[in-house]
Amino acid sequence: MKKIIAILLAVLFVTALAACGSKTAETAPAATQAPAAEQKQETYTSSQGTVDGFDPNQKTEFAMNTSEEVRTFNIGEVDPSLFEAPILVTSFGQSADTSMMDAIMKRSGVKDYAFNALAKDTDIKNYKTVIIVCGASSKGLGAAGISEADETARAEKIMAAINETNPAVIMCHLGGSMRRGVLSDKLTDMVLEVAKYMVVVEDANFDGKFTTVAQEKNIPLTYLYAIKDGMDVFSALFNK
């Protein structure tokens, strides 16, 4: 009889422990860290909207001319007299890089310029210099409420207006390799057809694209090690 009672007590004890463990598992707070794939999606903005042609995780080794010690590097010589006020800063691709360009202009002390990321073709006639910041962002396009097709059409209309009124055009590519891709490159190539100067954060040149264009089209090019290095470049260009 004592053995039976002992066995029953042991069974009850084990059952109680199992129930307690199950309750703890049910009430334990969920982990706050998302899976790696979800984290990458939140922190990575596609360089070209919904169809990605550049893998940000694929590292490409290439020799850079800029560094921590050498902040800028020039190919060719820019003529500041070509770039007169009034100046327009706009975007092809609606990336946050355009707002960074606005900050550069302000901190460089440039006075007579307007910032309008969504400028229209009808605005172009009012400016002697147009700075176009190239680099598409799905997040930026979504925030602006426009599609890739809409942005491409806007860019094409602006380019038609530029060909009519002939302002001096500066192509800026400030987002580095993350702003390379099918749509980003398509928008950039539009601007390179008429650009008189290029300013590029150098790690976007992983395939030699911008160096090749500069040499083939004889367009002055300044490489930046980081976006902030653009302040000295644009201060020298416009505060003459």
Question: What do the predicted segments below correspond to?
Answer:
Residues 1-9:
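Positively charged n-region of N-terminal signal peptides that target proteins for export
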Residues 181-212:
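Structural recognition of alpha->loop->beta junctions
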Residues 80-108:
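Short, charged N-terminal beta->alpha structural module
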Residues 8-16:
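Bacterial N-terminal signal peptides
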Residues 142-165, 214-221:
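A short, gly/pro- and small-residue-rich
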